[in-house]
Regions:
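Short alpha-helix plus adjacent loop in nuclease-associated cores
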Residues: 168-229
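Conserved ANL (AMP-binding/adenylate-forming) active-site segment centered on the GW(Y/F)…HTG consensus within
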Residues: 417-420
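A structural signal for short, well-ordered beta-strand segments and their strand-loop junctions
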Residues: 93-96, 145-148, 167-168
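Short glycine-rich phosphate-binding loop at a beta-alpha junction
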Residues: 143-151, 302-304
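Short amphipathic alpha-helical segments and helix-helix/interface helices
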Residues: 58-61, 110, 131-139, 154
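Short active-site loop/helix that positions an aromatic residue
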Residues: 150-161, 172-181, 191, 313-319
Length: 420
């Protein structure tokens, strides 16, 4: 009631609660010795079943059958047509792959499958020998699989030559549907937010780190199992929320198919003409230098065109232009909008107008050069393509965004931007 009266949003409420250490403790679960139960009151850490060959995988699959009922059980509907999901979470398989999900260069260190509290743990080096049997399991049980980040997990699995059809439930997408104004950058952040877990060693269990030594560290495996437990706990908690909000059909009919399409787009990447990009960068660099030289000629000195303080001295002290609006620090603003206004108002002042025109041209072409350079840097050397990441769970409005590189910051208001 207090938070409501103070109009605190979800993020502020979460920060306040965490500051009082009201969250549940989970870090100790990953620090216990291997021969301990390795469980906590808040997370059910699964029992690890190390898979070394196809026979061991077959044995685990056989033991998991009893706990792996079909989501269609006790219902006349096909799994994809169900309106609710929480009632069948106990008969699903949680999947989590540790590794890098970077499009165009993914990697995996370990894959885990958990059913009924027992987790099959497959190191990356083992998977090649069991891939056919593992793929058959994934194909036959996709509508019973629970993941955190279907798109990201698909990239990691693809690095192993594995394919995952649209799963039953995605805790990352579910969290976005339940709280669209909250974005978790990692599994740990999602668990901390939705499960109120205090992760004291969050940096130590960061997602996406690969150990290429080939040795299995018991501490690393305990952290892997902790991640597996987080996925299961998030699934149980968020499934109830999704049912309460009647969003399960939205999750399965819109969000998961979109994730599948985005995964394909990221994996294929965008073909680019590397030579043309290089030529454009060099041309923009020349234009930026020419504009800088012109600006210096009008200024009468080699003023730093990136320095607001030096620009203010030239524009307002030397050239006598009327100052722009003040910033919070007390200085005058020299952003693009303010400079454009000054250029319009300085038409009768040939020196000032020439300087401002050259300055604006320098800024514009320099920005275009930097954008093209970022695209060149993002080209994958293996296939000559750009593999951006499309963010599906960032904007509360539901729009997509792209990062690494950001393809949405390319200006298209002029011919040069459209050429890019």
């Amino acid at each position: 009631e207090l938070f409501t009266s103070l109009e605190f949003g979800p993020r502020t409420r979460s920060k306040v609660l965490k500051s009082f250490n009201a969250g549940k403790q989970a870090s100790d679960a990953a620090d216990k010795h291997a021969d301990d139960e390795d469980t906590s009151d808040d997370l059910r850490i699964p029992e690890a079943v190390t898979i070394a060959d196809e026979a061991a995988l077959a044995a685990w699959i056989d033991s998991a059958r009893d706990g792996l009922g079909s989501p269609a059980d006790n219902s006349d509907d096909e799994p994809r047509n169900r309106a609710h999901c929480a009632d069948v979470m106990a008969s699903t398989c949680a999947l989590y792959a540790e590794g890098s999900s970077k499009p165009g260069n993914p990697g995996c260190s370990v894959l885990m499958l958990e059913v009924g509290g027992k987790a099959a743990v497959l190191e990356a080096g083992v998977i090649a020998g069991v891939r056919p049997a593992l793929q058959r399991f994934l194909d036959g049980h996709a509508d019973r699989i629970v993941v955190h980040g279907y798109k990201e997990q698909s990239h990691i699995l693809a690095s192993l030559g594995l394919d995952l059809a649209e799963p039953w439930f995605d805790t990352k997408l579910a969290g976005y549907l339940v709280q669209p104004d909250y974005h978790a950058d990692s599994l740990e952040q999602a668990a901390s937010h939705f499960l109120q877990l205090q992760l004291d060693n969050a940096d130590d269990v960061a997602q996406g780190q690969l150990d290429l030594s080939g040795d299995v560290d018991p501490a690393d495996q305990r952290k892997d199992l902790l991640h597996m437990a987080m996925v299961r706990a998030l699934a149980d908690m968020l499934a109830a929320k999704i049912d309460e909000r009647e969003q399960f059909r939205l999750l399965q009919s819109i969000e998961l198919p979109v994730s599948h399409v985005l995964f394909g787009m990221e994996q294929v990447g965008a073909s680019v003409d590397f030579m043309r990009l290089t030529e454009m960068r060099d041309r923009f660099a020349v234009d930026a230098r020419d504009a800088q030289e012109t600006a210096w000629q009008f200024a009468g000195s080699r003023v730093n065109l990136q320095s607001p303080k030096q620009l203010q001295a030239v524009l307002f002290d030397d050239m006598g232009l009327k100052p722009t609006k003040k910033t919070k620090s007390g200085s005058y603003t020299t952003n693009a909008s303010a400079l454009q206004d000054l250029a319009v108002r300085s038409v009768g002042n040939e020196r000032a107008n020439g300087f401002l025109t050259a300055l604006l041209r320098h800024r514009e072409t320099n920005k275009l050069k930097q954008i093209v350079q970022s695209l060149i840097d993002a080209v994958n050397p293996d296939d000559g393509r750009i593999h951006t990441t499309f963010e599906q769970t960032v904007a509360a409005t539901g729009r997509l965004s792209s990062v690494d590189p950001n393809l949405q910051n390319i200006p298209n208001r002029n011919a040069e931007g459209r050429e890019i």
